């Protein structure tokens, strides 16, 4: 007897093939049979010809620490995400003082019993900080060797690759040659290199050149993170150049793919607007520099020069002090005016200081034409750049945390026709699974883990928006993780059947 039988479903198997009407049987957490399946089951679900797909795989998340604080991961499960890869943008939880080894961190995640499957990369910024702190100095040969050893250890203990965050300290202090040597440490393990590039604005093309160079010289697969152009003057121009560069690299044998989130706004920490040199010595050193009048004047000048016409596009998404709650959902320009016409850079710096760097932003900087052009490429997959959150998360976090995958399907595939439905599902399931190296997930096929999403296409809607992000998406009927029903009609069942995934 099967544990579960889902009958009469339009099965989209994740390969890109047209849907077929059939049944899926589940036994011991895995798919036991697909097609016209006979036999009894402990639980039978009549899909009513709704669509059944593999669970969605988020190749670019930041759930590392959040999965320990919010193991039920409503923001993931309620949009159909069953597997989540953290450690992106150069930042991972391990190795650190709290978790000296990746094995320590992954063991802690297992103890937390998450509702989703959890995998991770090791962050170059985290590695560099462990060896050099927040030093702007060029790494010595000995320091690079230490970084390589820590990277290799993380891979031995289950990481799937390495990431960089080249706009964030301390990753941004690295030379290209340092990156080549440290990234190469994942090569013997078949790991991949995911990069938040040095510049996604006016120097986007140069940044892609560097990413391609690092991957080629290091001998690894490349994942360009959240590919986009944030320079308005280069909209509908730069990404056509970079996509052509990627296509050419692929023809020449370099295994490079991209991910993106389907929104015209990004999100990050408010302190990303502080010039990177101010972080030398760490966050506390940066906060002290913001309080020094002479240093602050220089920072103000540099920040305003690089933000011409942009302060009005940057909104406070969350902060914690009670006296500043009124700022959430308002732009830096609005806040500056409310404070009596204050300089916008000073306004930003004062918020960072008041919140001790615990403040986030949403930044509107991309155009729809670029989003769709990138999305249409066969080597691009969705990645939320979000994290595991509850429906009671504070502030106004970016809606990508809660709605990326449903928006991809409902708005861009169904409504806009950017990708056929079966292709869109492939890009959300088997494409990231193969990229990461998950041989037993991403397809509806006998022997695969039963991560499944049942949805009603006509009712799919990414309800989470910038004004009210903390909500479930419409149209997701059921979500199974390793064969266990974990979400149903917008509600979490309480199940916590996720697994910690380690590189094998």
Label the predicted regions:
Residues 9, 286-292, 372-379, 385-387, ...:
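C-terminal cap of metal-dependent C-N hydrolases
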Residues 115, 121-122, 126, 130-141, ...:
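Active-site neighborhoods of metal-dependent hydrolases
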Residues 1-5, 10-55, 462-465:
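Histidine-rich, glycine-flanked metal-binding segment
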Residues 344-352, 421-429, 444:
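Short, well-structured alpha-helical segments that form the helix of a local strand-helix-strand
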Residues 9, 24, 29, 49, ...:
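Divalent metal-coordination and catalytic microenvironments
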Residues 92-217:
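Hydrophobic, small-residue-rich alpha-helical packing segments that form membrane-like cores
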Residues 12-23, 333, 358-365, 369-371, ...:
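Acidic, glycine-enriched loop/beta-strand segments at the rims
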């Amino acid at each position: 007897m099967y544990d579960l039988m889902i009958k009469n479903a339009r099965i989209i198997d994740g390969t890109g093939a047209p849907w077929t009407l059939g049944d899926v049987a589940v036994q011991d957490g895995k798919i036991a049979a697909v097609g016209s399946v006979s036999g009894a089951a402990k639980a039978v679900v009549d899909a009513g010809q709704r669509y059944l797909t593999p669970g969605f795989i988020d190749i670019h998340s930041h759930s590392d620490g959040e999965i320990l604080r919010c193991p039920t991961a409503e923001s993931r499960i309620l949009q159909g995400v069953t597997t989540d890869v953290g450690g992106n943008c150069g930042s991972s939880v391990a190795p650190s003082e709290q978790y000296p080894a990746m094995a320590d961190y992954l063991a802690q995640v297992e103890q937390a019993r998450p509702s989703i499957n959890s995998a991770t990369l090791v962050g170059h910024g985290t590695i560099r900080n462990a060896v050099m702190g927040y030093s702007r100095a060029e790494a010595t040969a000995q320091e690079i060797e230490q970084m390589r050893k820590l990277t290799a250890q993380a891979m031995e203990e289950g990481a799937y690759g390495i990431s960089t965050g080249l706009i964030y300290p301390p990753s941004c202090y690295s030379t290209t040659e340092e990156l080549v040597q440290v990234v190469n440490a994942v090569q013997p393990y078949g790991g991949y290199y995911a990069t938040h590039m040095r510049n996604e604005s006016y120097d986007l093309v140069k940044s892609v050149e560097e990413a391609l160079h690092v991957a080629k010289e290091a001998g690894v697969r490349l994942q360009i993170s959240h590919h986009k152009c944030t320079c308005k003057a280069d909209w509908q121009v730069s990404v056509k150049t970079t996509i052509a560069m990627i296509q050419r690299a692929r023809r020449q044998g370099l295994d490079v793919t991209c991910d993106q989130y389907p929104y015209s706004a990004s999100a990050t920490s408010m302190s990303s607007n502080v010039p990177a040199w101010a972080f030398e010595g760490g966050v506390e050193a940066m906060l002290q520099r913001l309080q020094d009048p002479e240093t602050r004047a220089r920072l103000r000048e540099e920040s305003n020069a690089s933000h011409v016409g942009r302060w009005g596009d940057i909104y406070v998404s969350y902060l914690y002090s009670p006296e500043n709650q009124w700022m959430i959902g308002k732009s830096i320009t609005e806040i500056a005016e409310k404070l009596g016409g204050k300089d916008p850079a000073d306004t930003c710096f004062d918020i960072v200081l008041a919140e001790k760097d615990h403040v986030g932003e949403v930044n509107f900087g991309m155009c729809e034409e670029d989003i769709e052009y990138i999305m249409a490429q066969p080597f691009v997959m969705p990645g939320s750049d979000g994290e595991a959150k509850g429906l009671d998360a504070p502030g106004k976090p970016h809606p990508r945390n809660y709605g990326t995958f449903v928006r991809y399907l409902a708005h861009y595939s169904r409504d806009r026709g950017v990708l056929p439905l079966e292709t869109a599902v492939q890009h959300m399931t088997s494409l990231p699974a193969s990229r990461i190296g998950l041989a037993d997930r991403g397809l509806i096929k006998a022997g695969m883990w039963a991560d499944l999403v049942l949805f009603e296409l006509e009712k799919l809607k990414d309800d989470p928006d910038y004004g009210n992000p903390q909500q479930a998406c419409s149209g997701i009927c059921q979500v199974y993780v390793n064969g266990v029903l974990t979400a149903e009609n917008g509600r979490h069942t309480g199940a916590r059947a996720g697994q910690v995934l380690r590189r094998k």
